[in-house]
Amino acid sequence: MRMNKFYMPTLREDPQDAEIASHKLLLRAGMIRKTAAGLYSYLPLGYRIVRKVENIVREEMDNYGSQEIHMPITQPREIWEESGRWKTFGPEMFKLKDRNNREFCLGPTAEEYFTDLVKGEIKSYKQLPLNIYQIQTKYRDEKRPRFGINRSREFLMQDAYTFDVNEEAMGEAYMNMWRAYEVVFNRLGLEYKIVAGDSGAMGGNSSHEFIALSDVGEGVICYSDDSDFAATDEKAYVYYQVNDENVEKLSSEKVLTPNCKTIEEVSDFLNVDAAHCLKAVDLMVEGKPVIVFIPGDRELNMSKLVSYLKCPEHEIEMMEEQDILALNSSPGFTGPIGLDCRIIIDSRVKQMKNFVVGANEENYHIKNVNYGDDFEGEIVEDLLMVQEGDIDPETKSPLKFKRGIEVGNIFQLGQKYSKSMNATFLDENGKEQFFWMGSYGIGVTRSVSAIVEQNHDDKGMIWPLVVAPYHVIITIVNTKDEEQNTLAEKLYEKLLLQGVEVLLDDRKERVGVKFNDRDLIGIPLRITVGKKAAEDIVEFSERRTLENVEMSSTEAYEKVMEIINSNLKSVGGLYR
């Protein structure tokens, strides 16, 4: 492609609303443009990258036995009512009506669509297993879209679904797709970790997330170097020791604690460690009061609570002051004794002795409280958020923490959707059975963002060869020099004949502008044709190292072909 005709509107400065490197650089390089909050257009360079990621995903899905289909973006309300998710999915779902007042949504995911399709077509165990996928636009009305295409309202995603005869076969399909996803992310050149994840609104019994490591990632993972333990901070079990076995229980006592509303204030005033000052989290769950009590030195893990309550997270809100007063309690002084509402307690509280709780009266707490003697509630094994200093439950070694971007996820759905939507087949005995399902997703456009986050410097992006918009850029230093033009054209045509994807910078621009743009857009292999063109000498460099080496045009051509042939399975076919 000749750049004098190429649509690549680069920017010299970072856009003001861009927060992270990928957002800044993709905008500056003229690869994307913001249309509205969370909505982006992909320009020629950017769209080539998206298509390459998409095609890598497509090839590995095909290699691992998944068949591609294409389904509508618009999904009817009826199938979401069948699954029970029309109301529970939450405000992230875009909803609309047609001219006949029939309700639809813009698909945020596709479990319902795929289940509805298969239940009408697959009737016998002889037609199983089935593995089908699509690469399609998804929509989620994010409350706060940010970070460019990393968290947008409209995004491209691959979603696959497996249908099997039993739980064992579902597990085999799950591991097959696990391996396929590993190959995809390895080919994309991402540094990532696979961690146990929270199933959330998807449901199911088991899930894992593929997290591309990045300091700007919104997700946090924890892992151990001494075992296979790895999980998101939402999923990780907290190994929290309470050493009160030999402590003698004391009699409870109401004490004055003027203006002590926080754990820190109560701990300091009563000279009691923070862990033994019970933290009350005052919530309204589906309109009803629920108080959660946990050790005072920890934070409540909302994902674990949602999993226990089995209700949508958007149905859980913090209590307003009037809600607390209606319970005959006092804001900042809520305690479990005498409360007439649902009480949920982390199991570690049951093991503690002589802790402090709010007295449900302003400026008062009760000390030396003990579970079972003074109050009771629903015990949940683990409601705590993992934090620095926690240890691996298996090896007791300290956990390590890293931030990351979720680029893929896999779920064992079991029979959640087949049962709710009555999707069945006949087994070998002629008996009706529900499908065992798996769900799998790769964020195609989010993967593009993650690749940039892991591959950039202060000059611009550094694309891995496999997803680069072009393999090579040839820069003509002076387009008024006929010998430079001739040599550049010769190299350009020669590489094109081999199926190499080449950008020829033949613009009538200052050479500094050309070099800056070249660094910014991050084409991995670079040939500069300059003042030594008459001697058949060019400069070759790689974007990752920026080291310029003079060589003949033939040597430069051979160098390009050597690198491409060693890095790509094929050129000009698979990745075009």
Swiss-Prot record:
It is found in: Cytoplasm. Pfam families: HGTP_anticodon, tRNA-synt_2b, tRNA_edit. The keyword Protein biosynthesis applies. One of its GO terms (biological process) is prolyl-tRNA aminoacylation. One of its GO terms (cellular component) is cytosol. Its EC number is 6.1.1.15. Keywords: Aminoacyl-tRNA synthetase, ATP-binding, Cytoplasm, Ligase, Nucleotide-binding, Protein biosynthesis. GO terms for molecular function: aminoacyl-tRNA deacylase activity; ATP binding; catalytic activity, acting on a protein; proline-tRNA ligase activity; transferase activity. It catalyses: tRNA(Pro) + L-proline + ATP = L-prolyl-tRNA(Pro) + AMP + diphosphate. Catalyzes the attachment of proline to tRNA(Pro) in a two-step reaction: proline is first activated by ATP to form Pro-AMP and then transferred to the acceptor end of tRNA(Pro). As ProRS can inadvertently accommodate and process non-cognate amino acids such as alanine and cysteine, to avoid such errors it has two additional distinct editing activities against alanine. One activity is designated as 'pretransfer' editing and involves the tRNA(Pro)-independent hydrolysis of activated Ala-AMP. Consists of three domains: the N-terminal catalytic domain, the editing domain and the C-terminal anticodon-binding domain. Homodimer. Belongs to the class-II aminoacyl-tRNA synthetase family. ProS type 1 subfamily. This is Proline--tRNA ligase. It comes from Finegoldia magna (strain ATCC 29328 / DSM 20472 / WAL 2508).
